[in-house]
Amino acid sequence: MQQGWLSNWLVKHEVVHRSLGFDHRGIETLQIKAEDWDSIAVILYVYGYNYLRSQCAYDVAPGGSLASVYHLTRIQYGIDNPEEVCIKVFAQKDNPRIPSVFWIWRSSDFQERESFDMVGISYDNHPRLKRILMPESWIGWPLRKDYITPNFYEIQDAH
């Protein structure tokens, strides 16, 4: 499998990762261990990836792991030719913990909160990690594949 510049750089500096190749738009995708995410995030920011385009999370498989996905952009040579990279950080479903990157990219605030709320990934050192879409009293994480839908929903006044 062909590796991009980031994967080659990480190999050169002995940072453990797994190259997942390139997507249909030619964007390099890497799998990173949760314990390495802090240092790799700093490396990417210093290199110029100062824009977090999006962050999302998904359930890989029932009983399997959860993934937090970060799409980062670096605009160096003009807006028409941005460099992008996709980082996937996996966590075990029994204790899904991933370091928050709020202190690097402030735009991750609501995105990490939504991932916590819908999938149940805890983002360590996030300053306001609480539910953002579901009521605080909600039990479970609705976007997990093993989620059991309640038999009833309490209708709440929006005011």
From Swiss-Prot:
GO function term, MF aspect, one: quinone binding
PROSITE patterns noted in UniProt: COMPLEX1_30K
Cysteines joined through disulfide linkages: none
Key words, A-Z: Chloroplast, Membrane, NAD, NADP, Plastid, Plastoquinone, Quinone, Thylakoid, Translocase, Transport
Top-rank taxon: Eukaryota
Cellular localization per UniProt: Plastid, Chloroplast thylakoid membrane
Listed EC numbers: 7.1.1.-
Enzyme class (EC, first level): translocase
GO cellular component terms attached to this protein's record: chloroplast thylakoid membrane; plastid
Bilayer topology annotation: Peripheral membrane protein
Catalytic activity: a plastoquinone + NADH + (n+1) H(+)(in) = a plastoquinol + NAD(+) + n H(+)(out); a plastoquinone + NADPH + (n+1) H(+)(in) = a plastoquinol + NADP(+) + n H(+)(out)
Gene3D superfamilies linked to this entry: NADH:ubiquinone oxidoreductase, 30kDa subunit
Record's function text: NDH shuttles electrons from NAD(P)H:plastoquinone, via FMN and iron-sulfur (Fe-S) centers, to quinones in the photosynthetic chain and possibly in a chloroplast respiratory chain. The immediate electron acceptor for the enzyme in this species is believed to be plastoquinone. Couples the redox reaction to proton translocation, and thus conserves the redox energy in a proton gradient.
Family: Belongs to the complex I 30 kDa subunit family.
Alphabetized HAMAP family for the sequence: NDH1_NuoC (MF_01357)
The protein's name: NAD(P)H-quinone oxidoreductase subunit J, chloroplastic
Originating species: Oryza sativa subsp. indica (Rice)
